[in-house]
A protein has these predicted regions:
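Bacterial Sec-dependent N-terminal signal peptides
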Residues: 6, 14-36
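Beta-strand elements of well-folded, non-transmembrane domains
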Residues: 33-37, 52-55, 89-91, 126-128
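Short coil-to-beta strand junction motifs in C2/discoidin
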Residues: 41-48
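Tryptophan-paired
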Residues: 49-80
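A short, solvent-exposed beta-strand micro-motif common in secreted/extracellular proteins
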Residues: 72-97
Length: 128
């Protein structure tokens, strides 16, 4: 009887691990700035309350990584996401700009990340 219980527990553990891997997707974030060349780097300002990369199904928040060379990759749970942030962008000519990404800032505008590999292009607006 005890062996049966151990076997059931191990089977459940292995099944749970396999399912959790299927729930993850690899997301590639690309950035554009109002028709300008892609920035060398974009660093989100996480001190602002409106900065988010939030799964609206689970309400889990992810840290927006530094986007270097106009692109970055991150692994998140599959779901529907709101993405919004203000950031400091450094352009190829060395100048810096304060930018905002708000195209996916509400549940109505949220982006669907349910495939295994998803690409999201963030259109940044220059603030100053």
């Amino acid at each position: 009887m005890r062996k049966l219980i151990y076997i059931l527990i191990l089977a459940a553990a292995f099944t749970a691990c396999e399912k959790s891997q299927d729930l993850n997707c690899l997301v590639t974030l690309n950035v554009e700035i109002d028709g300008q060349d892609a920035p060398i780097s974009v660093a989100a300002d996480h001190s602002l309350a409106g900065t988010m990369f939030r799964n609206i199904n689970t309400l889990e928040n992810y840290t927006i990584p530094v986007i270097a060379g106009g692109t970055t990759q991150m692994q998140v749970l599959k779901g529907i996401y709101m993405i919004a942030f203000d950031a400091d962008a450094i352009l190829a000519d060395g100048s810096s700009r304060r930018v905002r990404s708000s195209q996916y800032s509400s549940p109505e505008k949220a982006v669907n990340l349910t495939g295994d590999n998803c690409t999201v292009t963030l259109k940044l607006i220059v603030l100053q």
